[in-house]
């Protein structure tokens, strides 16, 4: 998926978290509806296509389905097709799915996740299984499923004439195409998160050149691996460094809703995920809600990048905690 970058200075953020000011929100008592059952169904439907490895029929079919679902909920949708150099320096075709749901704000909030599956199960104990693709129920489909349910809920509010923020949805492709463990050739840099790199550069170009495709964004929220029964979401380093105010807002909302057991106060090492390129290349402050397990050697769940990343590891309570926190956060004025 990506690599954890260990910076010694990350420890300084431990002091910053305890010093954050608590501010009262005008919507302090509001909870916004979210259906974990619906999100779970969206995840299962993605998994039913098979592994969504770029360039495969399963990938293409799932992408078409995602476009139809977003259109069904009233969003404007298009596929951003392009290519990026992969780990071997070859051009890798990609398809980002970009949608816009107009609300009551001029600047939209970015909701994003990756929708592709990793072609290799690098962390499989058995060597012969390492060349099979990861099904990606949690690593990929879970974030997309939560976003689809949030869009569905927002469309209901909009149909009633109620306030919603304008939202841009970007489902990144080729996030999990990073250098495989078995590769022995010369490795190129920035081999993970190809779709977000492509989108971020295009976004910056559209903004700088005043193109009609430019969509002004307030901030972004990335969802990655948000279905694990034992998930904990720390304040990831890059999120806090580039978008600390929005981290504080989301974690404070989670605490108010009773989800502090998931959204913990721990500060995680820097994680190179899609949000890194949204922050550094696009210049949009973006936070990463990602399950992090420092007690494990990989930093992630035991079944990360294995054949066991399937629906058995998707939990309704975790989906509810994440989905309700995110929709309540973005709808708070």
Regions found by a protein language model. Name each.
Residues 27-33, 48-57, 84-87, 129-141, ...:
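Second-shell loop/turn segments in exported
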Residues 81-83, 91, 219, 226-333:
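Active-site-adjacent substrate-binding region
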Residues 44, 51-104:
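A non-catalytic alpha/beta surface segment that caps or lines the substrate-entry region
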Residues 131-245:
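Acidic/histidine-rich catalytic neighborhood of metal-dependent amide-processing enzymes
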Residues 20-62, 73, 297-313:
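N-terminal capping segment at the start of a domain
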Residues 53-54, 83-87, 104-105, 115-119, ...:
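Solvent-exposed loop/turn segments at secondary-structure junctions
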Residues 38-45, 61, 65-72, 142-149, ...:
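Extracytoplasmic/secreted proteins, especially bacterial periplasmic and envelope-associated proteins
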Residues 16-18:
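C-terminal motif of bacterial Sec signal peptides marking the signal peptidase cleavage site
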